[in-house]
Curated annotation (Swiss-Prot):
GO terms, molecular function: 3'-5' exonuclease activity; DNA-directed DNA polymerase activity
Protein source organism: Escherichia coli (strain K12)
Coiled coil: none
Summary of subunit composition and partner proteins: The DNA polymerase III holoenzyme complex contains at least 10 different subunits organized into 3 functionally essential subassemblies: the Pol III core, the beta sliding clamp processivity factor and the clamp-loading complex. The Pol III core (subunits alpha, epsilon and theta) contains the polymerase and the 3'-5' exonuclease proofreading activities. The polymerase is tethered to the template via the dimeric beta sliding clamp processivity factor.
Designated name of the protein: DNA polymerase III subunit psi
Length: 137
């Protein structure tokens, strides 16, 4: 069912357009990954970098909190094509369009309560050891 306004515009021969990316009019801007960032953390509910479990993971990766860029899945879509950085997805299943090693885990609350999920996260980190700990030979 079309609205009266739509009908009137159609009668006047005015073509209506719809935006493919409405966020572009709402101040959406492209995000760049700063050079000092070594890890992009992606979650719907971003955890505090001071959380004990998050701190343990960052320490194991030899990454300081200032080298972490926290983004929601919606913000990841705003990264330029070809962006490269290692990433940790918490509670998001969809792979990122971000080049680099990607480790995935359940959301932090689930990760905290599930030793099997924590072990799986550590296993992924070991799998991508050469990406997280590059050797400068």
């Amino acid at each position: 069912m079309t609205s009266r306004r739509d009908w009137q515009l159609q009668q006047l021969g005015i073509t209506q357009w719809s935006l493919r990316r409405p966020g572009a009019l709402q101040g959406e801007i492209a995000i760049a990954i700063p050079a000092h960032v070594r890890l992009v953390m992606v979650a719907n509910d971003l955890p505090a970098l001071t959380d004990p479990l998050v701190s343990d993971v960052l320490r194991a990766l030899t990454v300081s909190p200032d080298q972490v860029l926290q983004l929601t899945p919606e913000k990841i879509a705003m990264l330029p094509q070809g962006s490269h950085c290692n990433s940790w997805r918490l509670g998001t299943d969809e792979p990122l369009s971000l080049e680099g090693a990607q480790v995935a885990s359940p959301a932090l609350t689930d990760l905290r309560a599930n030793p099997t999920a924590r072990a799986a996260l550590w296993q992924q980190i070991c799998t991508y050891e050469h990406d997280f700990f590059p050797r400068n030979d």
